[in-house]
Amino acid sequence: MASLKKSLFLVLFLGLVSLSICEKEKRENEGNENEEEEENHEEGSEEKRGLLDLAKHVIGIASKLGKRSEEKRGLLDFAKHVIGIASKLGK
């Protein structure tokens, strides 16, 4: 009877140890996935910021053109396109 209790205790102990190891690995994997998602989000934010800065610059140039309406219209269309791309990056 005593050897049965020892065997049962050993099996339970080893089972708990393996479960705790699995839980630890699972938490580490989730942490790595969260870090990757944050890095991707940061990269997207940087790209979006760069595109919005470009659009602002283009709009500034278009406003300085004044009477040259065709060139101005083309630049404003380009700026709208850039802003559209930047808004898609944010999603």
From Swiss-Prot:
Keywords: Amidation, Amphibian defense peptide, Antibiotic, Antimicrobial, Secreted, Signal. The modification Leucine amide is found at L65, L89. GO terms for biological process: defense response to Gram-positive bacterium. Its main location: secreted. Residues 1-22 form the signal peptide. Residues 24-49 are annotated as: Disordered. Residues 31-41 have a biased composition (Acidic residues). This is Preprofallaxidin-2. Belongs to the frog skin active peptide (FSAP) family. Dermaseptin subfamily. InterPro entries: Frog_antimicrobial_propeptide. Residues 23-49, 69-73 form a propeptide. It is found in: Secreted. Expressed by the skin glands. The keyword Nuclease does not apply. It holds the Pfam family FSAP_sig_propep. GO terms for cellular component: extracellular region. Fallaxidin-3.1 shows antibacterial activity against the Gram-positive bacteria E.faecalis (MIC=100 uM) and L.lactis (MIC=100 uM). No antibacterial activity against the Gram-positive bacteria B.cereus, L.innocua, M.luteus, S.epidermidis, S.uberis and S.aureus, or the Gram-negative bacteria E.cloacae and E.coli. Fallaxidin-3.2 shows antibacterial activity against the Gram-positive bacteria E.faecalis (MIC=100 uM) and L.lactis (MIC=500 uM). No antibacterial activity against the Gram-positive bacteria B.cereus, L.innocua, M.luteus, S.epidermidis, S.uberis and S.aureus, or the Gram-negative bacteria E.cloacae and E.coli.
